[in-house]
């Protein structure tokens, strides 16, 4: 992990087209602005983890469920 110190108004670039800028520091909260192409997905970590958990649940299955579906195919 790369750790950098930045002041308000300073920024970093990730690759050639993603800029992360420090907008405001207030107590324990840091406000950042991110400029990136629309093709770059930007998510808060907690939202990303929630999406990944839902995706994992969506691909889990019980073998009983498959046998139930096969009953409909035989009609």
UniProtKB/Swiss-Prot annotation:
GO terms for cellular component: cytosol
Keywords: Bacterial flagellum biogenesis, Cytoplasm, Repressor, RNA-binding, Translation regulation
Molecular functions (GO terms): mRNA 5'-UTR binding
Subcellular localization, as worded in the UniProt entry: Cytoplasm
Quaternary structure and interacting proteins, as annotated: Homodimer; the beta-strands of each monomer intercalate to form a hydrophobic core, while the alpha-helices form wings that extend away from the core.
HAMAP family tied to this protein: CsrA
Family: Belongs to the CsrA/RsmA family.
Protein name: Translational regulator CsrA
Species assigned in the record: Thermosipho melanesiensis (strain DSM 12029 / CIP 104789 / BI429)
Organism lineage string: Bacteria, Thermotogati, Thermotogota, Thermotogae, Thermotogales
Gene name in the database record: csrA
């Amino acid at each position: 992990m790369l750790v950098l110190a930045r002041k308000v108004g300073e920024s970093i670039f990730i690759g050639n087209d993603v800029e992360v800028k420090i907008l405001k520091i207030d107590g324990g909260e840091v406000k950042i602005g991110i400029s990136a192409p629309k093709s770059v997905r930007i998510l808060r970590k907690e939202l990303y983890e929630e999406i990944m958990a839902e995706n994992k649940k969506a691909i889990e299955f019980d073998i009983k469920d498959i046998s139930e579906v096969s009953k409909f195919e035989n009609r």
